[in-house]
């Protein structure tokens, strides 16, 4: 019978990352209409004052979103702690129930056995 050992696949070595000079050369050589440069560029017909107001509004929106996120995160942590406590309580109740069932079984079995023998 042949060995069923799995052959290990040897991957080629990872190429070295580009140097800063290579990155700069690549960026300088890219055309201005390259999607990398145009994807984030927004046309703003309002002019410079509109940009300032938009930036301020965006900062405010991000601030409020951050506050909502932090509040929600705190609520989730509290809910997680409450669930953990409830889980522990249920586990303890289950263990007590198992003990009670076991005690009832031990009490009921001897009397049943004696009645069936007599």
From Swiss-Prot:
Chain segments annotated as coiled-coil in the UniProt record: 69-105
Pfam family, one: UPF0449
Modified residues (Phosphotyrosine): 63
Keyword annotations from UniProtKB, A to Z: Coiled coil, Phosphoprotein
Keyword match Coiled coil: yes
Record carries keyword Cell division: no
Family statement: Belongs to the UPF0449 family.
PANTHER family referenced in this protein's UniProt entry, alphabetically: UPF0449 PROTEIN C19ORF25
Protein name, per record: UPF0449 protein C19orf25 homolog
